[in-house]
Structures are given as structure tokens and as C-alpha cells.
Amino acid sequence: MAIDRAQNLQDTFLNHVRKTKTPLTIFLVNGVKLQGIVTWFDNFCLLLRRDGHSQLVYKHAISTIMPGAPIQLFEGGEDAPL
């Protein structure tokens, strides 16, 4: 069940930044920094767009995703996730 919740949170986050076109900084496990906007994603990869070019990034290669602006995924107080 914990895996389902984690996947749901991941999909919720990625869908939110895709819809709002939030700029992201993505760090890969090898230290490479990528920047852009998510235009599409599935269970295994995401499509990152910047300056008219797209990059297909495999999720297993991603270490950290940092949005360029604060985001609010859930309504609620201290106990609400994120």
C-alpha cells in the first residue's frame, strides 16, 4: 500500500507541474543538472522541454526534482502531505 501512495504522490506532483508548466531543475544520479518543463510522463520516463528541444529522461536516472516556484498539491494544515 505504501508503494501505491508513493506512486500516486509522484503522479500528482508530475501532473501538477505539467499542467501549470512550472519550470523544474532535475538532478540525475550521475550529478548532471537538467532544466525545463515537463510536457509528458509515464511510469518509466518523462519528457522535458527547454528552448524548443525535448529530452526523454528515464525516471530511474533521476535523483532530485526541484520546482522553480513553491507548489501546493494538497489543501490542509500541518498534517497534509507537502
Curated annotation (Swiss-Prot):
One GO CC term, this protein: cytosol
Taxonomic source organism: Nitrobacter hamburgensis (strain DSM 10229 / NCIMB 13809 / X14)
Protein's gene: hfq
Protein function: RNA chaperone that binds small regulatory RNA (sRNAs) and mRNAs to facilitate mRNA translational regulation in response to envelope stress, environmental stress and changes in metabolite concentrations. Also binds with high specificity to tRNAs.
Ranges for domain Sm: 11-71
Protein name according to UniProt: RNA-binding protein Hfq
Xref: InterPro entries: Hfq, LSM_dom_sf, Sm
A single BP term in Gene Ontology: regulation of translation, ncRNA-mediated
GO molecular function term, any single one: RNA binding
Family recorded in the similarity comment: Belongs to the Hfq family.
Highest taxon of the lineage: Bacteria
Keywords: RNA-binding, Stress response
